Design a protein with these regions (language model features):
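N-terminal Rossmann-like NAD(P)+-binding domain of SDR-like oxidoreductases, especially those catalyzing
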Residues: 1-173, 215-218, 291, 299, ...
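C-terminal substrate-binding subdomain of Rossmann-fold SDR/epimerase-dehydratase oxidoreductases
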Residues: 7, 16, 97, 172, ...
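A short beta-to-alpha transition loop/helix N-cap that caps and shapes the active-site region
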Residues: 36-38, 119-120, 177, 244, ...
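Short, surface-exposed alpha-helical segments at coil->helix boundaries
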Residues: 38-41, 151, 187, 245, ...
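Short, solvent-exposed loop/turn segments at secondary-structure boundaries
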Residues: 82-83, 177-182
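Nucleotide-sugar-dependent glycosyltransferase donor-binding/catalytic pocket residues
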Residues: 88, 178-179, 210
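Short, conserved glycine- and acidic-residue-centered signature motifs
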Residues: 91, 146, 182-183, 274
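A glycine/serine/threonine-rich, flexible loop-to-helix segment
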Residues: 124, 180-188
């Protein structure tokens, strides 16, 4: 099949590109390179089944494809708060453009949504049926509400125009090709440790997150797109729950550094806990994560060690 991946030069988009090329598909990788990097796709430039298109998903595009994966949007607070208006435009206009293309060419279209649609949840763990607790006017709202609006658009195009949609809600994901400057907790901790710096925890470190290794997540994407029964949304994440203190201690242990842990003020609207209920993915997709946190951290640390040395 001929597949369009928006955000295809990003952390997850580039890994999805690798997987779909291995599966025998032709890939059009679209990215404006705001947070994506040619470094992530440099190894693919000579592949005859791969095409890179530098284009912003908020601008209309016409292509002939069988499937569309919409991954285009800054996904870390550092990046999505840098230009909040651009962030929400990317989620909303990007969704409209992908859905319009899917309608025209009769393609199946996939939306990479987020656990941020649950906000600071009052239900734990979070099932897909939970509507969330989101501040609509806070500093994170450009991302949270943009993704919620994209889900609305996907379901309205599905109901009104019969567009064939799939939606996943991504929980914290990590692995090689994360940017060292993206401000996410795993990359922050690892980079600080490898540089011999103090590890910064915001708040007292009791807040929890669940960390899914990229290869598990990509497998969930593909399983959802390849079946004809389930539209979504589907939580894709690792239900193993860790405090920020536990994560920092693991990183210090696995890097073998002498970094100390220091604390700074907690940012506004930072969720206190986040853990996916993955029963739907397990029963309908036969999916569950395989990579344990320590195993994934070792691979990610090795990547960053090489990256920083270069």
């Amino acid at each position: 099949m001929r597949v369009l991946i928006t955000g295809g030069a990003g952390f997850l988009g580039s890994h999805l590109t690798d997987r779909l090329l291995q599966d025998g598909h032709e890939i059009i990788c679209m990215d404006n390179l705001f947070t994506g990097s040619k470094r992530n796709i440099a190894h693919l430039m000579q592949n005859t089944n791969f095409e890179f298109l530098r284009h912003d998903v908020t601008d209309p595009f016409k292509l002939e494809v069988d499937q569309i994966y919409n991954l285009a949007c800054p996904a870390s607070p550092v990046h999505y708060q840098y230009n909040a208006i651009k962030t929400i435009k990317t989620s909303v206009m990007g969704a409209i453009n992908c859905l319009g293309l899917a309608k025209r060419v009769n393609a199946r279209v996939f939306q990479a949504s987020t656990s941020e649609v649950y906000g600071d949840p009052e239900v734990h763990p979070q099932p897909e049926s939970y509507w969330g607790s989101v501040n609509p006017i806070g500093i994170r709202s450009c991302y949270d509400e943009g993704k919620r609006c994209a889900e609305t658009l996907f379901f309205d195009y599905h109901r009104q125009n019969g567009v064939d949609i799939r939606i996943v809600r991504i929980f914290n994901t990590y692995g090689p090709r994360m940017s060292p400057e993206d401000g996410r907790v795993v990359s922050n901790f690892i980079v600080q440790a490898l540089r011999g710096e103090d590890i910064t925890i915001y708040g007292d470190g009791s807040q929890t997150r669940s960390f899914c290794y990229y290869s598990d997540l990509i497998d969930g994407f593909v399983r959802l797109m390849e079946q004809d029964k389930l539209v979504g949304p589907v939580n894709i994440g690792n239900p193993g729950e860790f405090t920020m203190l536990e994560l920092a201690e693991k990183v210090i242990q696995l890097t073998g550094t002498q970094s100390r842990i220091v604390h700074e003020a907690l940012p506004a609207d930072d969720p206190k806990q986040r853990q996916p209920d993955i029963e739907l993915a397990k029963t309908e997709l036969g999916w569950e994560p395989r990579v344990e946190l320590d195993e994934g951290l070792v691979e990610t640390i090795d990547y960053f060690r090489t990256y920083l040395d270069s």
